Curated annotation (Swiss-Prot):
EC identifiers of the protein: 2.7.7.87
Taxonomy of the source species: Bacteria, Pseudomonadati, Pseudomonadota, Gammaproteobacteria, Alteromonadales
Domain of life: Bacteria
Keyword Nucleotide-binding part of the UniProt annotation: yes
GO terms for biological process, alphabetical: regulation of translational fidelity; tRNA threonylcarbamoyladenosine modification
Gene from which this protein is expressed: tsaC
Listed name of the protein: Threonylcarbamoyl-AMP synthase
Length: 185
């Protein structure tokens, strides 16, 4: 279950598994964004209501285009995200019609990030697409900062764990509405 190489867990993710992996600030739980059963499993593990929505994290913007509707965004709005990516900034963007509500929750938008974390970059490049990302913790608990904390909260419940260093960020990503520019977190 414990892997040093994120690419070693690609098949696990593509087969519907939920994995934990280091991000810029905390350990994340992730799965295939195109697999509703995997997304539901992740939500159940975390005890998170589907209405809240989830984040997609990618290695580059092109990986996000199948999930968002960038046609309604201005050049300046897109550029505001590109100016901060890759990095610890999550942008709320309009979702593509037909996107699973398990990803977007009750919203007409989707939270997306292009990560600068080497492990996340490697994982998404190996997958060839983004991965669902939410902090590795039960709802109401503190996010896991080490593999040991992930195991303590999710032992026997996740399908893989990438061991590695967290990034240098002291807190989870800043969330910005790309249309209004408003900082939400």
């Amino acid at each position: 279950m414990l892997q040093q190489d994120p690419a070693a867990l690609v098949e696990t993710v593509l087969q519907g598994g939920v994995i934990a992996y280091p991000t810029e600030a905390v350990y994340g739980l992730g799965c295939d964004p195109d697999n509703d059963e995997a997304i539901q499993k992740l939500l159940d593990l975390k005890q998170r209501p589907w209405q809240k929505g989830l984040i997609l994290v990618a290695s580059d913007f092109n990986q996000l285009t199948p999930y968002i509707d960038s046609s309604v965004l201005t050049e300046a709005q897109l550029q505001s995200a590109f100016d901060k990516w890759p990095g610890p900034f999550t942008f709320i963007m309009p979702k593509r019609p037909g996107l699973s509500s398990l990803l977007s929750g009750q919203f007409d938008s989707l939270a997306v990030r292009v990560s600068n974390h080497p492990g996340v970059q490697a994982l998404c490049q190996a997958l060839g697409k983004p991965i669902v990302s939410t902090s590795a913790n039960l709802t109401g608990e503190e996010p896991a900062l080490t593999p040991e904390e992930v195991i303590r909260q999710f032992d026997g419940k996740i399908d893989g764990l990438v061991a590695g260093s967290l990034g240098a960020e002291p807190k989870p990503s800043t969330i910005i509405d790309v249309i209004s520019g408003k900082i939400l977190r």
